[in-house]
UniProtKB/Swiss-Prot annotation:
Gene3D superfamilies: 2.30.30.30, Nucleic acid-binding proteins (2.40.50.140), Ribosomal protein L2, domain 3 (4.10.950.10)
Name of the protein: Large ribosomal subunit protein uL2c
Ribonucleoprotein in keyword set: yes
GO BP: any one term: cytoplasmic translation
SMART domains with a match to the protein in the record: Ribosomal_L2, Ribosomal_L2_C
Assembly behavior: Part of the 50S ribosomal subunit.
A cellular component term, taken from the record's GO annotations: large ribosomal subunit
HAMAP family: Ribosomal_uL2_B
Record-linked InterPro entries: NA-bd_OB-fold, Rib_uL2_dom2, Ribosomal_uL2, Ribosomal_uL2_bac/org-type, Ribosomal_uL2_C, Ribosomal_uL2_CS, Ribosomal_uL2_dom3, Ribosomal_uL2_RNA-bd_dom
Length: 275
């Protein structure tokens, strides 16, 4: 995979950088029953309040039904196509099962069209196969890892990410996550072998503000540029200091350097915090 740069024939193209595998994706029509339209909620909750800032607008999207559970065990599936998914940074692969069923999975790196994948305890540890964690050999890269057995993969699903299985015990396995955190997982939880594809996604450059708006990302305004009524850093004459002992969030909580992770029962499974 390589990076594609553009000649600077406009100011926006000067800084634009894309991953070249974007142009190698399938242009065939995708199965209609594996996608449906969704309404953009622009970062609002059911009360209309903003719960996630800087969201709104953007291109219309259809949500693709991705199989994170891989619960169809023992049935071979052929990789027929690899598609772009606007809802995530990774690409998705279309599987045609031998019994006629079709589904999407997150496309691992180096997964080729025409290869066969399978899930189950007896599956070999090849790229794209899904196995219980206690059946994965030590040192293998894995992604789409379940936190709760049967719930579906929740960990290491972004483009270019992978975790590494570093130890096993009777009921648990020890995994090093992409963040550097070392954590225990139940051995019966499923994971997929390999690293998530589109590995050059983090090297892409947007190039212009308008492309961020296509993605539904609105501008981020500095607190010091606001009025005092809008932000703790706002107000004053000219470029004033923030007037506080430390930076604050828009809601007055301490920012920058304060640990915000809540204490949960699952902290028991964390052997070493992320770096």
């Amino acid at each position: 995979m390589a990076i594609k740069k553009y000649k600077p024939y406009t100011p926006s193209m000067r800084g634009r950088v894309l991953a070249s595998d974007f142009f190698d994706l399938s242009e065939k029509k995708a199965p209609k029953r594996l996608s449906f339209g969704i309404k953009s909620i622009s970062g609002r909750n059911n009360q209309g309040k903003i719960t996630c800032r800087h969201k709104g607008g953007g291109h219309k999207r259809k949500y693709r039904l991705v199989d994170f559970k891989r619960c169809k065990t023992g049935v071979l599936a052929k990789v027929s196509d690899i598609y772009y998914d606007p809802n995530r940074s990774a690409h998705i692969a279309l599987l045609n099962y031998l019994d006629g069923e079709k589904s999407y999975i997150i496309s691992p790196n180096l997964l080729k069209v025409g290869t066969y994948v399978v899930s189950g305890k007896e599956a070999s540890p090849d790229i794209g196969n899904a196995l219980p964690l206690n059946c994965v050999p030590l040192g293998f890269e894995i992604h789409n890892i379940e936190l709760i057995h049967g719930k579906g993969g929740q960990v290491a699903r972004a483009a270019g990410t992978s975790a590494k299985l570093i130890a096993k015990s009777q009921d648990y396995v020890t995994i090093k996550l992409p963040s550097g955190e070392i954590r225990l997982f139940r051995g019966e939880c499923y994971a997929t072998i390999g690293k998530v594809g589109n590995i050059d996604h983090n090297n892409e450059k947007i190039g212009k503000a308008g492309r961020n708006r296509w993605l539904g990302i609105r501008p981020t305004v500095r607190g010091s540029a606001m009025n005092a009524v809008d932000h703790p850093h706002g107000g004053g004459e000219g470029r004033s200091p923030i007037g506080r002992s430390q930076p604050s969030t828009p809601w007055g909580r301490p920012a920058l350097g304060i640990k915000t992770r809540r204490n949960k029962f699952s902290n028991f499974y964390i052997l070493r915090r992320r770096k």
